[in-house]
């Protein structure tokens, strides 16, 4: 079983939309990897009210460092945080799934 980090656009989406996209990402990742995955919880529903974007990115990169693979959801290219996560995965040899 591989540990899976999911990078996805979240701005202007409801919690329900985010969760639905994550479920789809998990199914695609399982097909691509050919095995079950343990999802790393990078959806910060209980983040501090005054948390800035850089706070979220720092937490995400910390979690990404523990991943066996990273899935990049549709539209990731248009979001700064997702692009930084992608660059980190690429530079540190974490397999990327799309």
Residue ranges and their predicted role:
Residues 1-98:
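Conserved catalytic or regulatory cores that recognize and/or transform ribose-phosphate-containing ligands
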């Amino acid at each position: 079983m591989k540990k899976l980090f999911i990078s996805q656009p979240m701005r202007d989406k409801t919690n329900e939309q985010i969760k639905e996209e994550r479920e789809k990402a998990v199914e695609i990742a399982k097909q691509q990897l050919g095995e079950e995955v343990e999802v790393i919880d990078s959806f910060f529903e209980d983040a501090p009210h005054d948390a800035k974007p850089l706070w979220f990115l720092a937490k995400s990169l910390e979690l990404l460092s523990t991943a066996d693979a990273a899935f990049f959801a549709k539209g990731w290219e248009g979001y700064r945080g997702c692009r930084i996560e992608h660059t980190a995965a690429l530079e540190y040899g974490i397999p990327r799934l799309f």
